[in-house]
């Protein structure tokens, strides 16, 4: 969340962001497309933008062409992302000791015998007395980011242009040790955008500006929602059950779900976002009527849509209970199975679809007196639907 006025912001509202004069998300821009950023607040923003500018205004101007030969700029960036401030997880032995202590303080019988505690401590029977760090099993320590930018600037006597291509690819933090060979449930995000800004001097007094921006992005994630999966990593004790049992079936029980199985064995979801931003602005110099007078007409069309493709399945899992003789020696294992292994099933859903058409008409007047005084006045008509 971004604030212009800090704690003075009304109703915790965010500022109005205008890109080349139209309200659009900052996330649609790469840094190579930005020419300048201007921040307005208080009376300055209120005067021009009314209620929309009550929490401040951020004006972003994208780059334009130049009246000379083409210039090409390209760059590539690679980054390694590392999560931080992740808690240390209690191991199975520590959990078992704490559980026994809690029960003892409540006047109840302990859950784990001394031989059970020793098995947790030594790891002699990891199937019945597991020590699973669910954070490490589900997540890995590093993710990667790739970013490529290319821009082309140029023009001639009456036409100039700026064009840019931007690609961003993020590969996430899911541990791939248990991934299915049939699909990937890795967290990933890929975005491709292309921009074209065109300036045309139609006459000596008429300037036409055309801006086009298209975006395609794709987001891949496990079928289990993040809001469900990540709390599960912290809720399931290290001593609850193994990731997989000796029979090759996912570990689990009828109370808690297996975080690893939930992250890799339930399928995956792919989110697709599409966006088109287009605007046309005509600027007419009216200095033939009076010096400093000009008029503008502008129209913009924005079309954004998001939809999800889901391929989901169920999985088989089993809980284990040791069978002990009178002396406390384990003689057998009781296996109770839940769920069933199914094939992937397909479904889709529409996230959102927005279409916005904006029209703006403006008359500007500028006057300077001996470089000591300056007058700027504007009459603006704005319509959005």
Regions found by a protein language model. Give the residues of each.
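Detector for glycine-centered tight turns/loop "hinges" at secondary-structure junctions
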Residues: 21, 246-248, 327-328, 371
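Small-side-chain secondary-structure face that scaffolds active or pore-lining regions
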Residues: 166-191, 221-228, 275, 288-385
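Residues that line or immediately flank small-molecule/substrate-binding pockets and catalytic motifs
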Residues: 41
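Membrane-proximal, glycine/serine-rich, low-complexity loop/turn segments characteristic
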Residues: 1-3, 7-16, 22-27, 44-276, ...
């Amino acid at each position: 969340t971004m604030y212009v006025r800090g704690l003075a912001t009304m109703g915790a509202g965010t500022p109005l962001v205008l890109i080349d004069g139209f309200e659009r998300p900052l996330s649609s821009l790469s840094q190579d497309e930005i020419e300048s950023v201007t921040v307005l607040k208080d009376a300055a923003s209120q005067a021009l933008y009314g209620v929309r500018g009550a929490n401040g205004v951020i004006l972003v101007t994208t780059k334009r062409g130049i009246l000379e030969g083409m210039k090409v700029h390209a760059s590539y960036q690679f980054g390694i992302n590392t999560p931080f401030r992740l808690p240390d997880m209690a191991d199975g032995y520590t959990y078992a000791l704490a559980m026994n202590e809690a029960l003892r303080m409540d006047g109840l019988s302990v859950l784990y015998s001394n031989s059970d505690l020793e098995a947790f401590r030594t790891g002699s029977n990891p199937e019945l007395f597991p020590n699973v760090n669910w954070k490490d099993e589900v997540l890995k320590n590093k993710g990667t980011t790739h970013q490529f930018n290319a821009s082309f600037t140029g023009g001639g006597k009456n036409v100039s242009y700026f064009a840019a291509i931007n690609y961003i690819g993020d590969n996430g933090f899911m541990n791939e040790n248990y991934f299915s060979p049939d699909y990937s449930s890795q967290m990933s995000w890929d975005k491709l955008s292309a921009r074209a800004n065109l300036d045309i001097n139609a006459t000596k007094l008429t300037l036409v500006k055309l801006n086009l921006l298209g975006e395609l992005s794709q987001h891949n994630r496990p079928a289990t929602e993040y809001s469900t999966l990540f709390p599960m990593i912290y809720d399931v004790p290290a001593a609850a059950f193994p990731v997989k049992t000796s029979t090759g079936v996912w570990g689990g029980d009828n109370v808690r779900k297996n975080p690893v199985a939930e992250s890799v064995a339930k399928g995956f979801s792919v989110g697709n976002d599409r966006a088109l931003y287009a605007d046309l602005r005509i600027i007419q110099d009216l200095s033939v009527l009076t010096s400093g007078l000009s008029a503008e007409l502008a129209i913009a069309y924005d079309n954004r849509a998001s939809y999800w493709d889901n391929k989901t399945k169920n999985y088989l899992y089993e809980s284990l209970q040791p069978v002990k003789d009178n002396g406390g020696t384990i003689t057998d294992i009781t296996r109770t199975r839940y769920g069933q292994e199914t094939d992937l099933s397909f479904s889709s859903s529409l996230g959102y679809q927005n279409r916005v058409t904006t029209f703006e008409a403006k008359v500007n007047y500028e006057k300077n007196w001996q470089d000591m005084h300056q007058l700027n006045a504007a009459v603006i008509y704005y319509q959005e639907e």
